[in-house]
Design a protein with these regions (language model features):
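A short alpha-helical cap/connector motif
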Residues: 1-139, 144-165, 169-223
Length: 223
């Protein structure tokens, strides 16, 4: 699974000792989802880190969303975390990686006890256009260069008071590095993220917040 790993996962922007304290001091994942997490760690599959899990649990508890959209299922860990926190919510999750889809189907089949989660297979750009209704929470954890492309469709799908969450936006701090100093194969990703920041961070159409959780979490809400 090495090709699925995020090289920025182990480059915390926040002081490493503080990250470790946050991850070890807050309530740990137990039971069935601990098995999913264990598999991810043993196989170097990127899933949301523990400090982000805790934040999601708090946020979802407060928002009580009826419908959640996730772009980037991976092995289904984050979708299962969300399902556990809001047992009455419908969760639609999208992925196109056959290897991840196979693992996600296995995990959802075992642990999605209330059949809350709908897995859609294929390119998110196509599937997003086919979705109907609105979503109260939209979580993007997929190709970072595509976030800016997905944003207009996500905004159309977002409920009036809904929130969009975009993961891994710090890229280990490389967002501060001049483009030409970044490895060539990472430049498209960085350009996509910078276009996103130019669009949303100082735009009166949006309320935004950047949280230093994991490799950076961007929150967007319609103003």
């Amino acid at each position: 699974y090495k090709r699925t790993s995020n090289p920025m996962m182990n480059r915390p922007v926040v002081k490493a000792e503080l990250v470790e304290w946050m991850r070890s001091s807050q309530t740990q994942i137990t039971g069935e989802l601990a098995e999913v997490l264990k598999f991810a760690k043993e196989n170097n599959i990127p899933v949301i880190p523990h400090e982000t899990v805790i934040y999601f649990q708090m946020l979802l508890s407060l928002l009580q969303p009826k419908r959640i959209l996730e772009i980037g299922t991976a092995i289904g860990f984050s979708a299962l975390i969300m399902a556990q926190e809001v047992p009455n919510a419908e969760i639609v999750t999208i992925d196109r990686n056959p290897e991840m889809i196979e693992l996600a189907k296995k995990n959802l089949g075992k642990y999605d006890h209330r059949n809350q989660i709908i897995l859609k297979e294929g390119d998110a750009a196509d599937i997003l256009k086919e979705l109907s209704g609105s979503f109260d929470v939209i979580f993007m954890d997929s190709a970072k260069s595509k976030y800016i492309e997905f944003l207009p469709i996500a905004l159309d799908l977002l409920s009036e008071n809904g929130v969009i969450l975009m993961d891994d936006i710090f890229q280990g701090g490389e967002i501060l590095t001049p483009i030409m100093e970044i490895k060539r194969n990472q430049r498209a990703l960085e350009r996509g993220l910078r276009k996103l920041f130019d669009e949303v961070l100082d735009n009166p159409k949006y309320l935004t917040s950047i949280l230093p959780l994991g490799d950076g979490l961007l929150m967007i809400k319609k103003a």
